[in-house]
Amino acid sequence: MNNKSSRRKFISTAVILTAGSTTMAETLSMKTKNNKIAHQVYFWLKNPEDRQKLIEGVNTLKKIKTVRQIHVGIVAGTEKREVIDTSWGVSLLLFFDDIAGEASYQTDPIHLDFVKNYSNLWNKVVIYDAEMV
């Protein structure tokens, strides 16, 4: 095998490997962008007596088209442990098909109305967004 032939073989192998790794990287990138999203919200109430009113408001969010699942909760009566935060009043867990679905939720009129009509009930809100892996 001469140098010219070896060089051609090397170049064609390099091209094939590069194309393969690029395709694999694109596939992984696309997979990451399309993973389901969990949107976890914790509300600290100004007045504990307003808990049911906030729960009613939170439940209006299930009408948003991009919401796939909704779970509303209150502090569980589980064993008290140092690592468990029981200072919040109402929790909300929403699932979306992807980041675009969660972004659409943020600007949906139902969500905007919820914030406008119920934000006076809480003095603190903390949100955790997680991408499913």
Can you annotate each of these PLM segments?
Residues I16-A19, A25-T27:
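A compositional/biophysical signature of low hydrophobicity enriched in polar/charged and small residues
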Residues N35-W44, R81-Q106:
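Short, well-ordered beta-strand segments in beta-rich or mixed alpha/beta enzyme
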Residues A25-M30, K62-W88, N120, I127-M132:
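Short, glycine- and small/hydrophobic-rich beta-strand elements in well-ordered beta-sheets
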Residues L94-V133:
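Surface-exposed, polar helix/loop patches in the mature regions of secreted/periplasmic/lumenal proteins
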Residues M1-T18:
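N-terminal secretory signal peptides and thylakoid transit peptides that target proteins
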